[in-house]
Amino acid sequence: MAKLLEITGKAISGEWGQDDDTGTGIPVLRTTNFTNEGFVNYKNVVTRSISKKNIAEKYLRHGDVIIEKSGGSDKQPVGRVIFFEGEENKYLFNNFTGLLRVQNPEEWLPKYVFYALYAYYRNGGTRAFENRTTGLHNLQVDNYVKSVDIPKLSCRKQQHICETLDHVRAAVAYREQQLTKLDELVKARFVEMFGDPISNTKRWDVIELGSLTGIGSSKRIFEKEYVSEGIPFYRTKEIVELSKGNPISTELYITEKRFLEIKEQYGVPQKGDLLISAVGTIGVIWIVDEKNDFYFKDGNLIRVDSSDRFNSTYMKTLLESLIAEYKKQMSSGTAYSALTISGLMKMKIYDVPLSLQNQFADFVAKVDKSKLFVGSAAAHKPFDIGFFSQKHCATPCKRGIISSKHMIFH
């Protein structure tokens, strides 16, 4: 084992400088340019006027690892890392990030060190080094560098791990491209059958959504009514997870007794209803299934009742486009963005034959089957260390990636 400090030395601090008024400044990478897959996103790279001397060593080189020092959230811890493979001696990095540069590449392959640190991050290791001030999450970089252990393997074994992970990462990226294309296929099929959802190119009659079905929220549940187990209580977070087909991490519950009271007096979501996020991440839609009883938070979510006058899959696809347009118009006129019940009720819906809606839903069901097949591979991220270490890792890490508090591979 070797401490990260022995491999890279202390993290090098970034630069920010002044506004670039002349357009001749230095490109500076920020946490905005971090991706959760460990790549650098070169969109929206800012240029800054930096006049400090002795910054030559701070220009990024191939194989540098950039670490996030400040940022993150309760859901996403600080400490992400990205691997730099771009043009050398062109980019700097800002003061919310740090540079970890392998001092002896002949002994430690930079990409191996990167993969090890990424594995550590994905397994929550950086949470132990977080400070929180005014909502920001800051990484105790010095303690991090002093504490993290990385196994000392031969260069041949390091290379094998890197090559294997590179192949897995490339395969996952390809699968994710396929998923994106399948989503685009659904949108293209919708336009082919019904025309543009905003401009109504096929001249359908339109009616207000509120005239088709009931639209509302939920009975208010007070904080004192939350319990540690019982009937799941969904907020925007859970609906976003469900809409993506991901397992949910329910944190709030109400008692079954309270649920049954609400069910009898006011009703609860039924199969085919649409739940739509109304604040924060606006416009995420989930079609309710019958897998589990649940209730949901008023204000956060809007419920569109299912109806024999429309197909829920068709309506979900149409509303996604209409709400996206609604958000554009809303963002230019208000400081606080939210989807309202009244706004949803007034949305103009195509009055198309139900038979056509059902045809579209059948097409979507076939695409969803393809997405399940493709997604089963894409879901296994190359940095999903439990998956990698148990099924694909070579002998050096076959016993698991993290085996002690600050160990990466084992």
Positions of the model-derived regions?
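Low-complexity, Lys/Gly-biased intrinsically disordered segments
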Residues: 1-37, 52-56, 69-74, 202-245, ...
